[in-house]
Amino acid sequence: MEQATTLFILLSTLLLAVSVESPQPPLFPDEALPTKSGYLPVKPAPGSSMFYAFYEAQEPTTPLPDTPLLVWLQGGPGCSSMIGNFYELGPWRVVSRATDLERNPGAWNRLFGLLFVDNPIGVGFSIAASQQDIPTNQRQVAEHLYAALVEFLEQNPSFENRPVYFTGESYAGKYVPAIGYYILKEKPNGKVNLKGLAIGNGLTDPVTQVQTHAVNVYYSGLVNAKQRVELQKAQEISVALVKSQKWREAADARTELLTLLSNMTGLATLYNTARAIPYRTDLVVDLLNQREAKRVLGVSETVRFEECSDEVEDVLRADVMKSVKFMVEYALERTQVLLYQGMLDLRDGVVSTEEWMKTMNWSGLGMFSTAERRVWKDEDGVVAGYVQRWGNLCHVAVTGAGHFVPTDKAVNSRDMIEGWVLGKGLFGGKDVKQTTSSSLYHSI
């Protein structure tokens, strides 16, 4: 009996040693590795460069030289596109733990190439040689981004004719129109084959959008009449400062308004009224500060990854309340534009976008305003959202989603972007007109 006990202890010790010494699975499975990643020099800012991660199409339906290329830009200002990569629409993402990458069922690179760029310089893994090199306005943002993208295309000559679609969310509601406007107006015959612009829950015309918060939350039942008046007064302060061209003060006033709104509603996050906790973007920070992640992406181990750069945000502070609506108007006359919003977002949601849309100086606005708003259902017959489209403009309201639409509705967001790029289903094809006025243009 004593010998059996001794043998059992020895075997247990050996098994324990084997289990301790067994290699851990890699943080990044082979399938999760980017096709390419690294740095793109930015002109005219010597020593500065933009970090990128590129994922080729998984199931392309055309030869790769003809396969659409989506360029994703995060908002902020000052937030990294690696949030979009590893938390929203990339092929693998973190869901519950920073050490566990899970396959994304709604990855946007199923049919298309997908390029994430840390924009502008100084954001995420991108490098700004000095603070003076960080852009202070959208013109400079566009110049840097264009230079980086041209470098990317030159490094990959077979990509030079690929149709390019710029996409992004939140403050990229400025970046996306800015790069589109720059290419269409100043580089129409350049190396970027621009085919469309897509903005999710964007901040594009801030002075109009900031005036929608009070009425939006009031009719949602989140504040009472007295609180609505208080919010309206806070909105008016920001608007007045814009009219006086006190741009930094206007941005500060907007921040105070959003803080007031958050305190009044008591929500975990204004980005999604249904969430009990904020979005877990912190998981991406934990992921990308691990040594293996930096090695895989080709980043120096000494670089500390931050979700958003306070320095970049401060440099662009005076830009926050400036409108780029005119850039969207210019683009609509020349290329496809998709505006989509998660319906649970209180910051940059449906009402916020619809208000500035109806003020656009665009030749197709009249026809768009009478176009049918159609019900979009997913494969199971569940309502996924609502689509209104005419000419070059497609507007989509996504049910069950907040600010981060691809996070909340992965497969639906993928179906939307694929349908829009390929011109299929509700997102493409013939224009649909109705004889009665659209509900889009109600007065608030």
UniProtKB/Swiss-Prot annotation:
Its EC number is 3.4.16.-. GO terms for cellular component: extracellular region; plant-type vacuole. GO terms for molecular function: serine-type carboxypeptidase activity. Coiled coil: none annotated. Transmembrane segments: none annotated. It is found in: Secreted. PROSITE patterns: CARBOXYPEPT_SER_HIS. Glycans are attached at residues 263, 361. Probable carboxypeptidase. Belongs to the peptidase S10 family. This is Serine carboxypeptidase-like 50. It comes from Arabidopsis thaliana.
